A protein has these predicted regions:
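C-terminal ends and interior cores of transmembrane alpha-helices
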Residues: 80-93
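Helix-to-loop junctions at the C-terminal end of transmembrane segments
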Residues: 58-71, 154
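Helix-breaking motifs and short loop linkers at transmembrane-helix boundaries and internal kinks
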Residues: 38, 70, 91-96
């Protein structure tokens, strides 16, 4: 069955909602994980480097992976890996194991982000109007839902890990719907062609692109500081 831009928009919005909800739920729970390990804020914050390191390590491989399997399968496989790894990470019995799993979580991020945003870009092109911002808005909505759910859960003095695991189970159940609605390779011009456009240095040195790159670096530095400080 061929997906429509509308069904693809729903699927991409849903996966952004899933990721946002899960992140919004496990970030408030991280201080409990830190206390379980019996370590200080400085050591635990350094642990976030493993997640960032995993994302950086996988970034050069992400385009090759997507070229081999397509964005649709990449979203599915990376989502399955991410959900599984987050579940293990929250239940890690020791800090070294937590770091190792956090590295694996990071390894899934780059490919997932490129794949899902490629789907969003193709949807916007086919719908002929700007929709990426509204799709990304579901990530923010998810973080609000996840953090509010964890706040209420902890207020009832319940173990937060059960909420996280419950959300992971619900996310697994939603993945078939996400996968079914995503656009197929033949529907996305950049994926359906077998010819690869040559990478030219002048495009990489395009001033507006460099400005956006530095803006993204600053944004992710701020996000990393916020997450580490919150934990």
């Amino acid at each position: 069955m061929t997906a429509t831009p509308q069904s693809a928009r729903f699927s991409v919005s849903l996966i952004f909602l899933i990721y946002g909800t899960l992140i919004g739920s496990y970030l408030p729970y991280l201080p409990f994980v830190k206390d379980r390990f019996g370590i200080g804020e400085s050591a635990f914050s350094m642990g976030f480097l493993f997640g960032a390191g995993g994302a950086l390590l996988s970034l050069p491989l992400a385009p090759w992976i997507i070229k081999q399997v397509g964005t649709r399968k990449a979203v599915l496989v990376m989502s399955l890996c991410y959900l599984s790894m987050v579940g293990f990470m929250m239940a890690a019995p020791s800090f070294p194991i937590f770091l190792a799993v956090f590295l694996l979580v990071g390894l899934t991020i780059s490919t997932w982000e490129i794949a899902v945003n490629s789907q969003a870009s193709a949807i916007e092109d086919q719908m002929g109007r700007p929709v990426i911002s509204s799709i990304h808005g579901f990530w923010s909505l998810g973080t609000f839902i996840g953090s509010a759910a964890m706040a209420g859960w902890l207020a009832l003095e319940l173990n937060g890990i059960w909420l996280i695991w419950g959300l992971i189970v619900l996310s697994f159940l939603a993945l078939p719907k996400v996968y079914d609605g995503l656009m197929r390779r033949e529907q996305i011009p950049a994926e359906s062609t077998k010819e690869s456009a040559p990478l030219k240095l002048k495009y990489m040195l395009y001033p507006p692109l460099i400005a956006v790159a530095f803006y993204m670096i600053a944004g992710y530095m701020l996000e990393g500081t916020f997450q580490a400080g919150g934990a």
